[in-house]
A protein has these predicted regions:
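Extended substrate-binding grooves/exosites of carbohydrate-active enzymes
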Residues: 2-41, 164, 203, 318-632, ...
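Beta-strand-rich binding/interaction modules
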Residues: 159-161, 244-280, 631-663, 675-676, ...
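Catalytic cores of secreted or luminal carbohydrate-active enzymes
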Residues: 205-229, 577-626, 632, 636-656, ...
């Protein structure tokens, strides 16, 4: 080992060739003990330094690293502030939050010139005291060593112990470990850390994320006995032809000459011994098992075992035990297809940043458990660790729960090579082909691989994200293949320079449209395909996802990763006591990309967004198609049959469950079968307008991530009943129809309807004195722009529709008494558009108190942009906030996002308002048959389809224009009314991306086609 450097240097901060000083070589994250542990026991050779530290913020220009007094053991830090570790300086109030996507955060304040760092460079001076725990100190006293490890920091650290400089480190997403044995003394010790905001490493860490700093993962001490297993490289292979496993491990043993033997034992997690051996200790100790009778690992059935290696001294005593959990599996590319244990795999994935609204990247174990629970519950089988190695515990969870991982190097340099308008500047790309960056980049991927190599869940190594291409990536790829000849290499950046196609084993693209992907798949490609990012889930998004899922019919299409998992918004308490989820720019940070980090399928508080409803159904491994003779079940799982699931079969009569049974259907993995079901259709056909045949796949037993009976997938088919949509009722004899000079009205059954000749529609609708018309319902042709709408220029393209309905004028009306019981009013409106299209609103009221409402748009003969939405908006008193409806649900649906379950659902306007980071269109329900809008006493309004055509509906505490004006959810006013929108149609939400791609044409509303809204309304 080279002599240690004992003096810190500021020059390292701007030298790309210096990225680690005195750092311990990267190694596996196996767990060590001073004894033979029980399964799952924590290490007794580690000591946490998490907790309260002291901290002071200074500028880099104020520090002399060679003679820095704050590092001295006797330095008086009583004036320092306090901070918890792990945490971020920004979240603790010591630095300002900044969010940018592509650009470097100092761009414009200074001209970014690599490898230089900004003149304004914050430094956090951390200090804390510690006493080495007895077990660790015993190892030190007996010839062993003690190290300190920083598991996560940003961006560069200098470390001193008791005034002695012990090391410098960059790449804060893999361990920075330093040997501190010589610096320790008995009793209380002091560790001091200078944590820099910027270093040359900042050029490699331009991830689309909040720019957060500090010691954000755990800090710990670890003892290494005088004979120590430094590294374990374990190959746990599974041979699908023989259905057996094999173990091949290489151990790096320090001071092996001081040990006699190394014994290895493989156990299942119940402690049963599967295999064991013993051999003489050597510096490189190889362990080979031969064939093993073990279960294979997969996301579907994540069987794990524990390899336990014990070092025995010459005196027969245990020197050290090392444990490593392993899963036996084989992941290879064969014939251009990625296969797990011999079977083609499809990644049903998401890209996941580590994030918590209060803690930033300093997420807790419970956060990770919540995330993986969400994944399993929503049929997500793969995660890309975008764009850096994650906390080590996440990999343990993925091994245990069953998640495939693309493990991604901490590398993104988007701002170095991309100008506005996606203009590529190859010469400025970092690292590109610049030799001064090569060692740092190779070191980053090496550190990740060494740490995570033994995890069964890691199936692909990724070289980084959005960093263009170049010889440096070729060097990284070569290194990965040398270290691991089995797992494939992933890198999307070569799409910008195909000269470097050899860098990646996988054709990976971002935001390629389904038709573009299909074109590749039809070209007889040599490489398998994945979308490392697709379905940009910003705000109200994830439309037309089914077009991508349909590509699974091509063998070389192997899935994609939704961008992304969680909204990244910082929870802040405002001066008035309210809380706000803040996004870029809210902290005065400039430049900023504002709300562009709000892309999650879960909200920042980890509650599922409505988008997750479609993701769960479309990602399901079991596809179910009921029919009148039974059900067809396709099992897309690779290894597990459906025998261990329960299938609940139901018949719904107009949404109401009338029959249910529980059955078992055994479909082997990869097969499709039909099962007969004796649906009691004839018993209920005459009682309903439509019958829904439903089959639901549910857990037969509880899992770690869900309780027994949890639904994973469903299938529904609607068949016709023989009952008409609405049976006519007998007219009451005491009804009154009045045609006045200014108004006309109908009274009957305690209800009164008043239609105005001057106001352009209904002006009163009462039941027992309760008024349901605050103002005449207005035409609506607008929706609050979604993030995708804004990105695609929807506001500009369809600006004419913003006020077309709102400001339409009534140009004609006719009111007539049809008969003794019925009144008809027809209002002709001219839309406020250049085309001046005429729309007809017709009310037919009778003495039962019912109202038949129809709205007709004839289709425009002149050229006009497609229509965002078309129907009526009805303003109701605020107490009418409850919504019960029959249609797909329970969450919101749109024309291109409605893989929901048909049924009768109960919600309310507040819960139905999805709190997207930027307020926007929300709460729509497609294909509604009827809906009831009521107060808590059950009084209200029922809206039903008239005839066979369903409608779209939403009930919100805010109007579209309120949503359009607000920048944050807390800016929306306290609700004073409810806004009921009854629509003939609303356009889809899109999802290909949020900056360029419009909603697909089939989900638009053409202006030249007629639209017809036809509903019955009654008060209840």
């Amino acid at each position: 080992m080279a002599d240690k450097i004992t003096t810190a240097s500021a020059a390292w901060l701007t030298d790309p060739t210096v990225f680690a000083v005195n750092r311990t070589p990267a190694h596996s994250n196996h767990v060590t003990f001073s004894h033979i542990p029980e399964i799952g026991e924590p290490s007794d050779l580690k000591q946490s330094l998490d907790g309260e530290w002291r901290v002071e913020m200074v500028q880099a220009s104020d520090i002399d690293l060679e003679e820095e007094p704050f590092a001295a053991e006797d330095f008086d830090d009583s004036a320092f502030g306090r901070i918890d570790v792990p945490s971020h300086l920004q979240n603790a109030g010591y630095m300002n939050h900044k969010y940018v996507n592509i650009q470097y955060p100092w761009d414009g304040h200074e001209n970014p010139q690599e490898p230089n760092v900004p003149e304004t460079n914050h430094v956090a001076l951390y200090r804390r005291t510690f006493t080495v725990a007895e077990r660790l100190d015993a190892a030190r006293q007996n010839g062993g060593t003690v190290s300190i490890t920083f598991h996560g920091m940003a961006t560069a650290i200098y470390v001193w112990v008791n005034g002695m400089f012990v090391g410098y480190g960059e790449d804060g997403y893999t361990p920075n470990e330093f040997d501190i044995t010589e610096a320790l003394h008995d009793g209380e010790n002091v560790v001091a850390v200078a944590c820099y905001e910027y270093a040359s490493a900042s050029w490699l860490e331009d991830q689309d994320y909040w720019r957060l700093h500090g010691l954000f993962r755990s800090v710990e001490l670890a003892a290494q006995p005088h004979v120590h297993i430094e590294d374990m490289k374990v190959e746990a292979d599974w041979n699908p032809e023989t259905a057996t496993g094999s173990l091949d491990a290489l151990l790096a043993v320090r001071n092996a000459k001081n040990a006699a033997t190394v014994s290895a034992t493989l156990k299942d997690l119940s402690g049963n011994v599967m295999w064991e051996t013993a051999l003489a200790a050597s510096d490189e100790t190889g362990i080979v098992s031969g064939s093993l009778d073990v279960k294979p690992w997969s996301a579907e059935s994540p069987a794990l075992y524990e390899l336990q290696v014990v070092v025995i001294g010459h005196d027969g005593a245990i020197v050290e035990t090392a444990t490593q959990r392993v899963g036996f599996r084989r992941f290879r590319i064969e014939d251009g297809i990625m296969k797990l244990n011999g079977k083609r795999v499809v990644f049903k994935g998401a890209d996941r940043h580590e994030f918590d609204a209060k803690r930033g990247r300093a997420i807790t174990r419970q956060d990770m458990i919540d995330d993986i629970t969400f994944c399993k519950r929503h049929n997500i089988n793969a995660i890309r660790t975008s764009h850096y190695p994650n906390q080590e515990y996440w990999y343990d969870l993925c091994d245990e729960y069953g998640i495939y991982l693309i493990d991604e190097t901490n590398l993104e340099t988007h701002g170095s090579w991309c100008l506005p308008g996606d203009v590529v500047t190859e010469d400025s790309a970092v690292p590109g082909s610049k030799p001064q960056w090569e060692d740092a980049c190779v070191d980053r991927v090496n550190s990740m691989m060494k740490r995570d190599y033994n995890h069964a869940s890691v199936v692909i190594w990724s070289l980084g994200n959005e960093s263009y291409a170049g010889d440096v990536f070729r060097a990284m790829s070569v290194h990965v293949h040398e270290l691991d000849p089995n797992r494939p290499v992933h890198y999307e950046g070569v799409t910008h320079n195909r000269k470097y196609d050899d860098v990646t084993d996988i054709e990976s693209r971002m935001y390629a449209h389904a038709d573009e992907i299909e074109e590749y798949l039809k070209s007889d490609p040599k490489k398998p395909y994945i979308s490392c990012e697709y379905m940009h889930a910003m705000g109200n998004s994830v439309g037309n996802m089914d077009e991508y899922v349909a590509l699974e019919r091509y063998p070389q299409y192997q899935g994609g990763f939704i961008w992304d998992f969680i909204d990244q918004a910082i929870l802040v308490r405002l001066p008035d006591g309210d809380e706000r989820l803040c996004y870029g720019g809210d902290f005065g940070d400039r430049p900023s990309d504002y709300e562009f980090a709000g892309d999650g399928i879960v909200f920042a508080d980890r509650t599922p967004s409505p988008k997750a409803q479609d993701v769960k159904q479309l990602y399901a491994n079991v596809r179910i198609v009921p029919g009148e003779t039974g059900v067809e079940i396709a099992n897309d799982n690779l290894f597990v049959s459906t025998a261990d699931y329960v299938f609940v079969t139901r018949v719904l009569a107009d949404g109401e469950p009338v029959w249910q049974a529980e059955q078992r259907f055994d479909v082997p993995a990869g097969e499709t079968k039909h099962f007969d079901i004796e649906w009691p259709l004839e018993a209920y056909r005459g009682q309903a307008n439509e019958l829904t045949l439903e089959v639901s796949q549910r857990l037969a037993a509880a899992e770690e991530w869900a309780s027994k009976g949890y639904e994973l997938s469903f299938g529904q088919t609607v068949v016709a009943g023989s009952k008409p949509v609405a049976a006519s009722e007998t007219k009451p004899v005491d009804g009154i129809v009045t045609v006045g000079r200014w108004n006309a009205g109908v009274q009957g059954s305690g209800r009164e309807i008043l239609l105005s000749r001057t106001q352009g529609g209904i002006v009163s609708y009462t039941l027992d004195g309760r008024e349901f018309v605050l103002r005449r319902p207005t035409l609506t042709t607008f929706r609050a722009l979604t993030d995708n709408d804004r990105g695609a220029g929807h506001g500009y393209d369809r600006a004419q529709w913003v006020g077309a309905g709102r400001y339409a004028k009534c140009v004609n009306n006719t009111i007539e008494q049809v008969n003794d019981d019925t009144l008809k009013a027809v209002y002709e409106y001219e839309l406020a558009t250049p085309q001046r299209t005429h729309v007809t609103i017709t009310y037919v009221a009778d003495t039962t108190g019912k109202l038949h409402l129809s709205v007709d748009y004839p289709g425009e003969t002149q050229e006009a942009p497609t229509i965002p939405a078309f129907g009526l908006e009805w303003t109701l008193p605020v107490e009418y906030s409850n919504l019960r409806f029959y249609g797909p649900g329970p969450d919101e649906t749109y024309a291109d996002r409605k893989h929901a379950k048909l049924g009768i659902w109960n919600t309310n306007a507040y819960d139905d308002h999805a709190p997207y980071l930027m307020p926007q269109e929300t709460g729509n329900h497609e294909d509604v048959r009827w809906a009831e809008i009521t107060d808590d006493a059950g009084h209200g309004m029922r809206v039903s389809r008239h005839g066979e055509s369903a409608f779209a509906l939403s009930l919100q505490p805010y109007s579209a224009f309120m949503l359009e004006e607000a920048q944050h959810q807390d800016e929306l006013p306290a609700p004073k009314h409810m806004f009921l929108r009854v629509l003939a149609a609303q356009m889809g939400v899109g999802g290909d991306d949020s900056w360029m791609s419009p909603v697909h044409p089939q989900y638009h509303i053409p202006a030249d086609k007629p639209l017809h809204l036809d509903v019955d309304i009654e008060l209840i």
